Curated annotation (Swiss-Prot):
Descriptive protein name: UPF0210 protein SP70585_0294
PANTHER family: UPF0210 PROTEIN MJ1665 (PTHR37560:SF1), UPF0210 PROTEIN SPR0218 (PTHR37560)
Family named by the database record: Belongs to the UPF0210 family.
Quaternary state and interactors: Homodimer.
Pfam family, one: DUF711
Transmembrane segments: none
UniProt-listed Gene3D superfamilies: 3.20.70.20
InterPro entries reported in the protein's UniProt record: UPF0210
Entry-linked NCBIfam families: PRK05313.1
HAMAP family named in the record: UPF0210 (MF_01221)
Amino acid sequence: MDIRQVTETIAMIEEQNFDIRTITMGISLLDCIDPDINRAAEKIYQKITTKAANLVAVGDEIAAELGIPIVNKRVSVTPISLIGAATDATDYVVLAKALDKAAKEIGVDFIGGFSALVQKGYQKGDEILINSIPRALTETDKVCSSVNIGSTKSGINMTAVADMGRIIKETANLSDMGAAKLVVFANAVEDNPFMAGAFHGVGEADVIINVGVSGPGVVKRALEKVRGQSFDVVAETVKKTAFKITRIGQLVGQMASERLGVEFGIVDLSLAPTPAVGDSVARVLEEMGLETVGTHGTTAALALLNDQVKKGGVMACNQVGGLSGAFIPVSEDEGMIAAVQNGSLNLEKLEAMTAICSVGLDMIAIPEDTPAETIAAMIADEAAIGVINMKTTAVRIIPKGREGDMIEFGGLLGTAPVMKVNGASSVDFISRGGQIPAPIHSFKN
């Protein structure tokens, strides 16, 4: 490595807000299944605190050694609906509390996996888990929840969509932060290191390390050097920058897996913003020539960014996965917040951008009087984009306050302006229930 590359890396960290967003340890809880829910909770606590005992210490050690901030250390676990189904319990809050207790004991920031996979219907534990979500997220601090309601192979479970509209409302009514820790997916992935949607898939190894990186500030600085040049140059610049970012992510992941004695899983090729100035995906899109994100051309700019990040990342690391798409969470990106406030970015444009990125309606505040059926219809729209286009899409939406208010979440979750929602009713549409069938092009066998 020549001196120029060394100084570039130092600048990425000191001036351009580059960091490793998360080291996430995935832990299988299948061997914790027990017909007694309290025994299951104890087994869960013991396994997590044993397997992840050194996760935070190792993360801090690597950060100090390399001089690269590692912002979050997290744990993801087997979807709890699978564990709870073996019991006769009528709610799974006790399992959520076991997760929370374990997370606090080992010192991680979040623990994900209070989850259910219901894309084609409910099994015994699924409905119980879904109805437990409001209390589980209210009575815990670090637990995150996700529900997969659709897939390209299965279609969209509209009964579950309707239920999740209600659950999001109930969660927001019980807790200021609860809905910010709840994601509804289509085509959810099993190796996602990012919260709130992380869970440990049943096809994964017993314990695994996945890494998520963050580098929109680095990409923006690189694009500042090629202002006015063609999109060919822009694409090449993004690709080369993504290569460097991913290389560092791979190094951190491999070091962590070696020191913890577990398998290295994947690097998630996602650009994850923060509320800090200089760490915004929106500002990257504007650097390509948009006056403000949300104007015409935004979706095309996002497409270029997303694709070139993947091309550069795949060259840098063999093992890539997770969501691997630019994140556009409104409350967590100062450029997105500004665009909503100046009127150029609305829910409809964010829905269009979902066709490109992984989580379209992410960390969005909407009026608290929005009907549950309208929230469900938003979920259905996002799921349809994912199911038809064979990609992951998701909704993380917070019904709080009135249009124009600012909702403060703090920390990495930032501040969300309450956005306008279409007032026309979707009640009759959502009340049908049942299943939207899988698209014809899903029939591959």
